C-alpha cells in the first residue's frame, strides 16, 4: 500500500511484535499542517491488523469462520504534533484478554528523534454472525492459543485464579 511500510519478516510467534511503520501522507494533514486527529485511529487499526498477521491470525479467515471483531471503544492522547512526510513507528501491545474481550495499547513515536507523539487504546470483542459474544477458548481454541502464545505473560487466562 502506498505510503505505508510493513515489516515483511515472518517472526516466531513468541518474539515481540516489531511495530508498524507509517509515512504521513499530505491528505492526512489539516489546514494547520499537522496530522488530523481522526487519522491516528485509522493508524491504530492498520497496526492492529499488522499485529494480527504477525501473530499468525488472518482477519479474513476469522470472518470466514463466522467470527467478527467489532471495536467497543477507542481513545487517543496527543502529545506531540506529527506533520506531512514524517515517519512514525507504531507500537502495539495486547494489554488485556479474557477469551471474549481483547484490549490493545498503542504508542506512536517519531522515527527521527524517538519522541512519543501519541498514546491510545482500543477494546474489541469476539462475536458470531448473530452478534452474540464468542468465547474463543470454547469456540476456537486454535485462535485462542495463538493469542495466548503471542502475548504470553501480558495476558490473564480467565480460568486462572487472579490475586485480589
Predicted segments, located by residue:
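A broad, structural micro-motif
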Residues: 35, 69-71, 117
Amino acid at each position: 500500500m502506498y505510503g505505508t511500510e510493513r515489516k515483511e519478516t515472518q517472526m516466531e510467534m513468541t518474539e515481540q511484535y516489531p511495530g508498524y511503520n507509517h509515512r504521513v501522507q499530505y491528505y492526512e494533514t489539516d489546514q494547520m499542517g499537522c496530522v488530523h486527529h481522526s487519522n491516528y485511529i485509522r493508524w491504530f487499526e492498520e497496526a492492529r491488523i499488522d499485529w494480527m498477521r504477525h501473530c499468525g491470525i488472518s482477519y479474513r479467515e476469522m470472518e470466514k469462520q463466522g467470527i467478527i471483531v467489532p471495536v467497543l471503544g477507542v481513545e487517543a492522547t496527543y502529545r506531540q504534533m506529527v506533520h506531512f512526510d514524517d515517519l512514525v513507528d507504531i507500537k502495539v501491545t495486547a494489554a488485556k484478554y479474557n477469551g471474549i474481550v481483547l484490549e490493545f495499547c498503542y504508542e506512536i513515536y517519531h522515527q527521527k528523534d524517538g519522541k512519543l507523539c501519541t498514546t491510545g487504546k482500543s477494546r474489541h470483542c469476539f462475536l458470531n454472525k448473530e452478534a452474540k459474544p464468542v468465547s474463543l477458548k470454547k469456540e476456537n481454541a486454535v485462535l485462542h492459543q495463538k493469542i495466548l502464545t503471542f502475548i504470553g505473560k501480558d495476558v490473564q487466562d480467565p480460568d486462572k485464579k487472579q490475586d485480589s
